[in-house]
């Protein structure tokens, strides 16, 4: 089944809602990077969050990059998502696995805080016009949801609730997705809406369990929290979009990257190896560049 993203509003346009499923995208990331259970969860959550943020970009070619730089054993994370529904990403240590811990509900969960450690979340928004907008906030707990909510509050001054989660068992990834609910600028001084948003979100005890219950029915997921949507289900479906793991790497980009190395470095490659092999960090595609191609880059 294809991943997707839907948008809706509630409270007469005062609250913006976006829901996304990233089950298949997370499965592909797991396969490409040989992710562990823990890193599959982290990558899935980060892909969901980045797609939720990218959904508000004004232009279809707009992109959002999430980066975690910290002292934890995860050794960093980078996710790149587009307004067009494309997403890709990787972590520093894809094989990382840690003991499960008990949460406040006495259920076992992944130890995201220990995995990420102490550090920062960087959010880069690029609409293709001028310099990208870069924001940095301290990590809250590494579970991505609260970290993104902190970014939205401190960097964009937007009261928001961000939920990301997954269901993973011994057979693999069952589901992965996220939900964003935020007060729109025109209603940000309406404190009754802020109270409404807080009250509705408090009703969510476990987003991962709710996500698993609803499967890929994103409209039902939103209605579980905001049953009084402004749009009908058919209207929401008509504006939904597909989400997919898609890398922007190509052979042409690989050749351009090699050319930047300069004549001396290319001649060294030709002399020592007679070829070059480049591996994309985001998708693990391998590009083999033969000797004659290296020579042509020098000429």
From Swiss-Prot:
Superkingdom to which the source organism belongs: Bacteria
GO cellular component: cytoplasm
Principal subcellular localisation of the protein: cytoplasm
Modification note: Under oxidizing conditions two disulfide bonds are formed involving the reactive cysteines. Under reducing conditions zinc is bound to the reactive cysteines and the protein is inactive.
GO biological process: protein refolding
Keywords of the record: Chaperone, Cytoplasm, Disulfide bond, Redox-active center, Zinc
SUPFAM superfamilies associated with the record: Hsp33 domain, HSP33 redox switch-like
Keyword Metal-binding attached: no
InterPro entries: Heat_shock_Hsp33, Heat_shock_Hsp33_C, Heat_shock_Hsp33_N
Cysteines paired by S-S bonds: 247-249, 280-283
UniProt function note: Redox regulated molecular chaperone. Protects both thermally unfolding and oxidatively damaged proteins from irreversible aggregation. Plays an important role in the bacterial defense system toward oxidative stress.
Name of the protein described by the UniProt record: 33 kDa chaperonin
